[in-house]
Amino acid sequence: MVLTLSNQFLAKIPATPKTLTLPKTSSSTLRPQWSCRKSDIHPEFREDAKVYCNGELVMTTGGTQKDYTVEVWSGNHPFYLGNRSALLLDADQVEKFRKKYGELTQIMEIPVLKGEIILPPKKKSKAKKK
């Protein structure tokens, strides 16, 4: 089944604009790269920028700087490590509360309700007269 479109806008194939240039590709790259930016105003992009965490090389990525130094990355972040985290985690909110108000036994004990809880019936609102 062949679909024929009579729309004049879809029938035309746009030519490559003259502002876009296709740089010469080396034999190591398999795909052509378009360059649409002005020359001499952008920083140099490095394909082999190294990322260091605590003085240890953790990854190689692309970027505008030669090396990056980070404090936390996925290899030592508690979210990615779960219980194997090497970082000291802060006490959760309950532990902070117990540490602060631990001597007050009245608020530390949770009351246990006995028997049935009877809620009073809701009062019906008076109908508005018009």
Swiss-Prot record:
GO molecular function terms noted in the UniProt entry: rRNA binding; structural constituent of ribosome
Main location: plastid
Keywords, comma-separated and alphabetical: Chloroplast, Plastid, Ribonucleoprotein, Ribosomal protein, RNA-binding, rRNA-binding, Transit peptide
Record Pfam families: Ribosomal_L31
One GO cellular component term noted in the UniProt record for this chain: ribonucleoprotein complex
PANTHER family noted in UniProt: 50S RIBOSOMAL PROTEIN L31, CHLOROPLASTIC, LARGE RIBOSOMAL SUBUNIT PROTEIN BL31C
Annotated function: Component of the chloroplast ribosome (chloro-ribosome), a dedicated translation machinery responsible for the synthesis of chloroplast genome-encoded proteins, including proteins of the transcription and translation machinery and components of the photosynthetic apparatus.
Subunit structure: Component of the chloroplast large ribosomal subunit (LSU). Mature 70S chloroplast ribosomes of higher plants consist of a small (30S) and a large (50S) subunit. The 30S small subunit contains 1 molecule of ribosomal RNA (16S rRNA) and 24 different proteins. The 50S large subunit contains 3 rRNA molecules (23S, 5S and 4.5S rRNA) and 33 different proteins.
Protein name in the entry: Large ribosomal subunit protein bL31c
Species annotation: Spinacia oleracea
Name of the gene this protein is made from: RPL31
